[in-house]
Amino acid sequence: MDHLKRQDEKVFAAIEAELGRQRSKIELIASENFVSEAVMEAQGSVLTNKYAEGYPGKRYYGGCEHVDVVEDIARDRVKEIFGAEHVNVQPHSGAQANMAVYFTILEQGDTVLGMNLSHGGHLTHGSPVNFSGVQYNFVEYGVDAESHRINYDDVLAKAKEHKPKLIVAGASAYPRVIDFKRFREIADEVGAYLMVDMAHIAGLVAAGLHPNPVPHAHFVTTTTHKTLRGPRGGMILCEEQFAKQIDKSIFPGIQGGPLMHVIAAKAVAFGEALQDDFKTYAQNIINNANRLAEGLQKEGLTLVSGGTDNHLILIDVRNLEITGKVAEHVLDEVGITVNKNTIPFETASPFVTSGVRIGTAAVTSRGFGLEDMDEIASLIAYTLKNHENEAALEEARKRVEALTSKFPMYTDL
């Protein structure tokens, strides 16, 4: 970044500081990952200069012959990975992908059945502070009070009672496998569309390690980062019958020109996801998550649903007599990055919470293995149990430094 360093020292310094943070801390935020240098090169390419409103072969600007190739590569690779009939890779985010689906099939005030945010859903699945909850009549389903797993009989009962036009499956903090086939059966029984938001598990689905929602859902949305390990962005997969409507909802419906440099980075990441070593990577994510969950439980920590089937773990910190906010802060102080998170049947404010959400996608990208999960579990428990003991926190910092020093990253930057 020689040009940036010479031209804008302040921005360069901030980026360098962030690189230092990523290198020196243990990244456990479940929605984050470390992309390859190839993905970063594509995103930092000259494609950032090109406007390309429209779609390949049907642009509103000239000079799009090369970016057309890039977008076609991205779309074709997604079809190969997930078996989708139609793909739109232009959404700038997962939220915009969800918005486009809503705009395609819903009218203002239509009833939608979505997962309660504190039970593991997402803001765009009907939260009253989000456009989705403002524009549409969302009815919530959740998890069982004892098992903390989705109660499909309750989903069916609510669907029969409220007759939604759309059912939304998928979550941002649900550590268990989702039965997409069952969701489609429920949707068919009440005459609803089914949309699956697979943002968190897309990489696991790509590797064949989580059931694929594409054969069951009318629409599938996802981000392109998280477990898929691409740049920050979104995409939509759908049945061919909805292709024109979905494309129109994205452009000109809710977006103008696509970010062609980001689409290039998406294409590179999708190419990586087609390789055999990506399947190994995804399996390691799950293995690490299971090992970490076991370690946390051995340390006496409480896990929502009692464990995990994917990359994600939700810790209930109430038995430690602290809040999620305190837990996030003290873990960050010793070099472990997590996020506070609501838990099912939450009683605390979303700014405080009773839980912490962690995930293994980023540490697995870095090369951490099973024995390292044992150390991370020990570190988390030790830090939370001694959150007011500065000597203990200093000891934890040293252990974090010793662990991260074993796994250098982005050494060419």
From Swiss-Prot:
Task: Give EC number(s), comma-separated.
Answer: 2.1.2.1
SUPFAM superfamilies from the UniProt entry? PLP-dependent transferases
Cite the Pfam families for this sequence. Answer: SHMT
Q: Binding of (6S)-5,6,7,8-tetrahydrofolate: at which residues?
A: L117, G121, H122, L123, E239, S349, P350, F351
Give the positions of the site Plays an important role in substrate specificity. H225
User: Residues bearing N6-(pyridoxal phosphate)lysine?
Assistant: K226
GO CC entries: cytosol
InterPro entries assigned: PyrdxlP-dep_Trfase (IPR015424), PyrdxlP-dep_Trfase_major (IPR015421), PyrdxlP-dep_Trfase_small (IPR015422), Ser_HO-MeTrfase (IPR001085), Ser_HO-MeTrfase-like (IPR049943), Ser_HO-MeTrfase_PLP_BS (IPR019798), SHMT-like_dom (IPR039429)
| Signal peptide region | none
Keyword terms: Amino-acid biosynthesis, Cytoplasm, One-carbon metabolism, Pyridoxal phosphate, Transferase
Catalysed reaction, written as an equation: (6R)-5,10-methylene-5,6,7,8-tetrahydrofolate + glycine + H2O = (6S)-5,6,7,8-tetrahydrofolate + L-serine
Q: In which pathway does it act?
A: One-carbon metabolism; tetrahydrofolate interconversion; Amino-acid biosynthesis; glycine biosynthesis; glycine from L-serine: step 1/1
**Location of this chain's protein in the cell:** Cytoplasm
Residues passing through the membrane, by range: none
What does this protein do, in the record's words? Catalyzes the reversible interconversion of serine and glycine with tetrahydrofolate (THF) serving as the one-carbon carrier. This reaction serves as the major source of one-carbon groups required for the biosynthesis of purines, thymidylate, methionine, and other important biomolecules. Also exhibits THF-independent aldolase activity toward beta-hydroxyamino acids, producing glycine and aldehydes, via a retro-aldol mechanism.
What's the subunit arrangement here? Homodimer.
Q: What is this protein called?
A: Serine hydroxymethyltransferase
Instruction: Please name the source species.
Output: Bacillus cereus (strain AH820)
Instruction: Please name the gene that encodes this protein.
Output: glyA
